[in-house]
Amino acid sequence: MEQIAARVTYINLSPDELIQHAVKNGEGVLSSTGALAVTTGKRTGRSPKDRFIVKDEQTADQVAWGNINQPVEQRTFDQLWERALRYLSERAVYISHLQVGADDNYFLPLKVVTEFAWHNLFACDLFIRPSGDHANGKPSWVILSAPGLKTDPERDGVNSDGAVMINLSQRRVLLVGMPYAGEMKKAMFSVLNYLLPPHDVLPMHCAANAGQSGDVALFFGLSGTGKTTLSADPHRFLIGDDEHGWSATSVFNFEGGCYAKCIDLSQEREPMIWNAIRHGAIMENVVLDENGVPDYADARLTQNSRAAYPREYIPLRVENNRGRPPDAVLFLTCDLDGVLPPVALLTKEQAAYYFLSGYTALVGSTEVGSVKGVTSTFSTCFGAPFFPRPPTVYAELLMKRIEATGCQVYLVNTGWTGGAYGEGGERFSIPTTRAIVNAVLSGKLKEGPTEVLSGFNLTIPKSALGVDDHLLNPRKTWEDVSAYDARAQRLIQKFRENFEKFKVLAAIREAGPSDVH
């Protein structure tokens, strides 16, 4: 176990104690909800250009190196790690012993060492707090977080005044100059996404919940497309809202908490999330008024305002944080063009195609320096920034799991209909999408009459309980059908161009869109 020398060391403090320290240290203030409110300066989202993975003998041929998985030399990592240790040795540090992964076979023990008390509270909220010594002899991973230490690009071999470095061989994650807490959780997500596939476990950027009978649903999607909102269902039990593994026998959460977007949060639309923001939770970059009352509509700090809270704050949850293999898999896509249907039933080849494509939108982007507003994107595996191995590794595992379980995969459009974004289209309302999801989870959607949507070759239902029939075929929602066809053809061309980079079976490639007839 890594030994950390510090001026003062606080080990395994309770959430209450960490909150007291954070307030006393001036790291944040208590809001009217009881949640700790903090701000993170200029870094209000992830910094993908500042994320590195150590390239060594173990990782050289296993990682898909490039703009997402940027390589860094072992020597560069070691020098910065030592500098961070020296920096922290002159300060009070907070240490918590946690774990990631709710499965007894695949969990990782985790030691989180932070400069800020609130970062340690975040780790306690988001990771899993084990009961007793649960390491089972497994070696522990270490997160070292020193947000007050700045990097120098010339001296440290990095791109800015901050860096996230993942050392897969040494089981170390280093965060320097990174006040945005989400970097910690996504770094460990990347670690699991690297480690699990060789163990026949598919790591997934998805939410998961379970019905009264134990049936499990998975919700894949980028941030802001509906994972957290749709999985927080008043009639189902939450497993988790963001990161899961799918083994031959179960679906299990990687985390012990939730990290919900707060922009425009309302009690009426999202009561479970609203009620979870209380003492013990963290509000990150949420604007408060002079009385400490949060204004969730105020985006002056960022569109990516967040709340972190433990799973225990969701009353309807699966206690053991895992479930059986899924009965339904939903790919949430936010279509800005308004040409995709609100729901389609996918074959396993289509599932692989749309999984690899990851077509969606960046909504209130989670990344630093992104343009304001909404832009379309293709994000492989519905989470390209977090998957170190080649994308086909994950797609092949997905197809294997679909074949083994016979689960139905659905494409669900949480984006626009009747026209494009900013051009007369309207976004599907949350109640409409919830009705679609309810129809999917009831099992009735796949039993009813269907038709094929030309061009995309998608099988779509002709009716869905609680949804206007005319919404189900996107071509019928546009006043000008020729305008729909032209916009659809444009998107189809984007799909094709994006997919050229993948080396896949012909059956998967042919499952994609063809020309509009």
From Swiss-Prot:
Q: Which residues bind ATP?
A: K186, H205, G221, L222, S223, G224, T225, G226, K227, T228, T229, E270, R306, T433
GO MF, one annotated term: metal ion binding
The cofactor remark states: Binds 1 Mn(2+) ion per subunit.
Any single GO CC term annotated in Swiss-Prot or TrEMBL for this entry: cytosol
Record InterPro entries = PEP_carboxykinase_ATP, PEP_carboxykinase_C, PEP_carboxykinase_N, PEPCK_ATP_CS
Question: Cross-referenced SUPFAM superfamilies, in alphabetical order?
Answer: PEP carboxykinase N-terminal domain, PEP carboxykinase-like
Q: Which amino acids does the record list as binding substrate?
A: R46, Y180, K186, R306
Instruction: Describe which pathway this protein belongs to, using the record's wording.
Output: Carbohydrate biosynthesis; gluconeogenesis
Q: Where would you find this protein in the cell?
A: Cytoplasm
Main enzyme class: lyase
Locate the residues binding Mn(2+). K186, H205, D242
Subunit architecture: Monomer.
Name the HAMAP family on file: PEPCK_ATP
Protein name according to UniProt: Phosphoenolpyruvate carboxykinase (ATP)
**Organism annotation:** Coxiella burnetii (strain RSA 493 / Nine Mile phase I)
Q: What is the lineage of its organism?
A: Bacteria, Pseudomonadati, Pseudomonadota, Gammaproteobacteria, Legionellales
